Amino acid sequence: MLFRSDLANIEGVRQNQLIGYGLVVGLNGTGDTLNNIPFTKQSLQAMLERMGVNIRGATIRTGNVAAVMVTGNLPAFGTQGTRMDVTVSALGDAKNLQGGTLLVTPLLGADGNVYAVAQGSLAISGFQAEGEAAKIVRGVPTVGRIANGAIIEREIEFALNRLPNVRLALRNADFTTAKRIAAAVNDLDRKSVV
């Protein structure tokens, strides 16, 4: 019998939400206003200093950077080295993330540990265009996705074979489906499984 995930979920097997703070660069003037958003300026300074560039005391004027929150779902049984999608959302006053690249961003679980690292070019579904007399915004240009944009660095241990019992939670609970699944499990238990 193959497990049909459209019928039931195995209790305890689930995705885990991850979150991180990062910078998107290459925004062609649509990023954060550094005078209004101090955390973007501080993050940019800290990142450049880690790379050996000292800009303390210098006046930074760039609209090409935005502070962002990065979120993703670590899949159940996600293994180290595999990739997952992430969503990138502007945190400051950036107008548009189109054309931006997310710099290396650690993604943390609720326990504070790093489980994945994200980086890459954003795909934006929204857009913004403006002229002298009008401005048009469609969708949400301050939110984007990076398909396969994070690499899983740490796995969440879940030893299904060490559980004393495995519980199934039916997606659409009804007596007939429950009875059929119970019969299939009991039949499997009687057979020699290799």
List the predicted regions and their residue ranges.
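Phosphate-binding glycine-rich loops and their immediate beta-loop-alpha structural context
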Residues: 137-192
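N-terminal targeting signals for Sec/Tat export/insertion, comprising classic cleavable signal peptides
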Residues: 7-30
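Signal peptide-directed extracytoplasmic domains
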Residues: 19-21, 30-161
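Signal for well-folded cores of large energy- and translation-related assemblies
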Residues: 8, 12, 49-52, 186-190
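Short, small-residue-biased leader/transition segments that mark boundaries at the very start
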Residues: 1-2
